[in-house]
Amino acid sequence: MADYQGKNVVIIGLGLTGLSCVDFFLARGVTPRVMDTRMTPPGLDKLPEAVERHTGSLNDEWLMAADLIVASPGIALAHPSLSAAADAGIEIVGDIELFCREAQAPIVAITGSNGKSTVTTLVGEMAKAAGVNVGVGGNIGLPALMLLDDECELYVLELSSFQLETTSSLQAVAATILNVTEDHMDRYPFGLQQYRAAKLRIYENAKVCVVNADDALTMPIRGADERCVSFGVNMGDYHLNHQQGETWLRVKGEKVLNVKEMKLSGQHNYTNALAALALADAAGLPRASSLKALTTFTGLPHRFEVVLEHNGVRWINDSKATNVGSTEAALNGLHVDGTLHLLLGGDGKSADFSPLARYLNGDNVRLYCFGRDGVQLAALRPEVAEKTETMEQAMRLLAPRVQPGDMVLLSPACASLDQFKNFEQRGNEFARLAKELG
């Protein structure tokens, strides 16, 4: 446990995570100072009187006088003010680093471009099914510092690349990078390898590394070692087995669960289940209760969620597909009896959309492209694409065209912030319109 007594601590970024950092230091007898580039950041009204605050910009004077800077994942380490502080030898950490220095129970750590919230939640459910007192959070749900509890027997953390950049004391009992595809390229000017390097920090001092056999970018930098356990579609220690028209989860040659017993559907969810099982096994959770959790878990909202099935048409909300890799995962192995009506669009965060093209062949695909990067997406297959300003216009356009056997899929491959508050609002709007139009 670290000692922060007498330290000049500055926290950048408020919100729930920033407040959890403030509470963390106050509980240890240290009064931090807080700054946020927003004029009225969320949580400002909950800040105790004694805490000095500076809003609307960063305060370089405070930063250069600090002994310790706790930076929100929302601010890039490359920001000139942080860069100058780092050059001056000032320590910069994030809330996850503070958490790792204090946590007394083992940590299962999960990152990846896609699937991480589902896998994090699943491992948490597996622990609960085993009667283990578990804390689940990080980049999903509660900030990590709010989970700290002497009674906790296991922590399961979802970690973003931004959080990992400021974390060096993570010693996970089991850690995984589920996949690495282009995302946040606006934060990583040196491209995919720079983004991957941030993700790879999760393996440092991990007891077991769970890697994706189908994605070489998830391997440790020196390649697989004795700490590595793998999962994949057709290969890996944990893989899928197809026999007589049925699909099984298989571990080292042994069939452990028929996927028809699971409530989750889709090949990407079956591989998520394999990854979760590998992590749970590595953390020492009993296999039987982990498999039971797999049969009861219904999935998370906005992640390939069937919001309406009516007149033979399935309306699926995959609004959490905020990058190309996530939409690829939804389309890979997708079975549609009739026509796929695919809604794409939003803010593509400078990504290359071309990997989607291979899934959009054939006569039974229609594209409806909207938002900031709609024109670029429509160019993937212009002869079957319609361009509208908004998602609502796209849905009103496609609704009269759907036939029994068709699927309407919102898997936008883009962030939502050009037209929505967040992906949840976009997904809720899709669900509302599906119920109205379907």
From Swiss-Prot:
One of its GO terms (biological process) is cell division. ATP binds at G112, S113, N114, G115, K116, S117, T118. Its main location: cytoplasm. It is found in: Cytoplasm. It catalyses: UDP-N-acetyl-alpha-D-muramoyl-L-alanine + D-glutamate + ATP = UDP-N-acetyl-alpha-D-muramoyl-L-alanyl-D-glutamate + ADP + phosphate + H(+). GO terms for cellular component: cytoplasm. Pathway: Cell wall biogenesis; peptidoglycan biosynthesis. Its EC number is 6.3.2.9. GO terms for molecular function: ATP binding; UDP-N-acetylmuramoylalanine-D-glutamate ligase activity. Belongs to the MurCDEF family. Cell wall formation. Catalyzes the addition of glutamate to the nucleotide precursor UDP-N-acetylmuramoyl-L-alanine (UMA). HAMAP family: MurD (MF_00639). This is UDP-N-acetylmuramoylalanine--D-glutamate ligase. It comes from Shigella dysenteriae serotype 1 (strain Sd197). The gene is murD.
